[in-house]
Curated annotation (Swiss-Prot):
Chromatin protein that stabilizes SPIN1 and enhances its association with histone H3 trimethylated at both 'Lys-4' and 'Lys-9' (H3K4me3K9me3). Positively regulates poly-ADP-ribosylation in response to DNA damage; acts by facilitating PARP1 ADP-ribosyltransferase activity. It comes from Mus musculus (Mouse). One of its GO terms (biological process) is regulation of protein ADP-ribosylation. The gene is Spindoc. Disruption phenotype: Mice were born at the expected Mendelian rate and are viable. Mice are however slightly smaller and display reduced levels of poly-ADP-ribosylation. Moreover, they are hypersensitive to ionizing radiation-induced DNA damage. The modification Phosphoserine is found at S122, S149, S249, S252, S310, S313. Residues 148-170, 203-270, 285-320, 335-381 are annotated as: Disordered. InterPro entries: SPIN-DOC_Znf-C2H2 (IPR040647), ZnF_transloc-Spindlin_int (IPR052675). This is Spindlin interactor and repressor of chromatin-binding protein. It comes from the Eukaryota. GO terms for cellular component: nucleus; site of DNA damage. Keywords: Chromosome, DNA damage, Isopeptide bond, Nucleus, Phosphoprotein, Repressor, Transcription, Transcription regulation, Ubl conjugation. The lineage of its organism: Eukaryota, Metazoa, Chordata, Craniata, Vertebrata. It is found in: Nucleus; Chromosome.
Amino acid sequence: MALKAKGAAALDCFEVTLKCEEGDDDDEAVVVAVIPRPEPMLRVTQQEKTPPPRPNLLEAGVEGCEELKQQVSWEQEFLVGNSPGGSGRALCMVCGAEIRSPSADTARAHILEQHPHTLDLSPSEKSNILEAWSEGVALLQDIQADQPSLPSLESGQDGQPDPISNPDPVRMPAEIVVLLDSEDNPSLPKRLRPRGLRPLELPVTPVIEQGNKKPRGQRWKESPENEPARKKRSRHMTKILDPDPDPPSPESPTETFAAPAEVRHFTDGSFPPGFVLQLFSHTQLRTTDCKDSSKDSRAAEGLPQPQNPSSASPPGLRGTLDLQVIRVRMEEPPAVSLLQDWSKHPQGTKGVGTGDKPDWPTVLSESSATVKGQPKAGSGV
C-alpha cells in the first residue's frame, strides 16, 4: 500500500493505492480510496482550543445540575412530597404521614419506623409511585377548582340536590298503592274481582248542613265527581237498601266513603322498596233495615260470621301483600243477634252453665222476639 499525492490535489486529499509485493509495475496498482486532507479540521480545532472560557461555563453548568440533583434526590429517594392542599407540609407518599422537619435523615427515620420495606424498592417502582402522586395532586387541584361553582348552583335550589336527576335509593319512599273499594258486588268470587292498581285517591266526603237538606237527585247533579261511585253499586245492594228519599248520612253505603284511620297509618313510607299494599275500605251501615244486607253479603262471600256481636270493631280492612295470600279482615259485626233461630230449639232442656248468668233464658227469649220482627235476609232477593 502506498500513499501518493497528484498535482494540485495534493493539498486537498490523499490517494490510496494498493500494489502487489511481487511486481513493481505501477500499472498494476489499483486506486482504493481518496482521503481528504485533515488540515482544515486541524486548524478549526486549534482555533477552538484558544478561548478557554467556554469549557469553564459548561463545567459550571454541570456542577449546578449535580447540586440540584443532589438536592431533589433525597425526596425522590425516600418518596416525600409536598401537601397538595398548598399548606407546604411534607408528606410521605407511601402512608401519607406528615414529616415534621423534612430532611433526608428524618425521612429515613420515618421509613425505618413505619414501613422499612420501602427502602428496597426498585427505581422503576419509585418512579411509578412518584407519577401516581403527581397525577393525584393534579386531580385534587382540578376538583378544588370546580368546587366554588357548585355552591352557586345549589344556592338556587336551597342547597338540596335534584331528587329526579340524582335519586337516592336509601331515602326513596316505598311505593304503596292503596285501593279503596266499596265491596259493592259481593256476589262475585274473590278471584274474579278486578285488582287493578290505581293511585291513591281519597274522595272528600261532602259536608251536609242539617238545616238545608236537598233531594237526592239534586245533590248528585251538584257533585258530579261523586256520581261514578254510585254507578258502581250493584243491583243486589240497591234492592235491599232503604229507598228513603232523604239524603243519607256520610256513614251510609250510598254515600262516598272516606279512608279510615288505618289507611293513613300505612302511607308513611316506612315499608321497604317494592312493597305494595292494597287496602279495601268498607263503610258502616246506618239503618236497621240495612243490617240484614250486611249479613247477606258475608254469606255470599262465604266468610265466617263473627261470634262476638257485642264488640264494636272499626270498618273492615282486607289487605294483600303482593301475590301472597295474606288477608286481614276486621268486619263490622251485625247488629242482628245471631240467635234468631234459637226459638226453634227447646229451651227447657238447656241448663245454666258455670260462666252463664242465671237469667240467660230470659235474655234469649227477648232476643228471639226482637228477631221475629225483622225481615229475613233472603226476602229481598
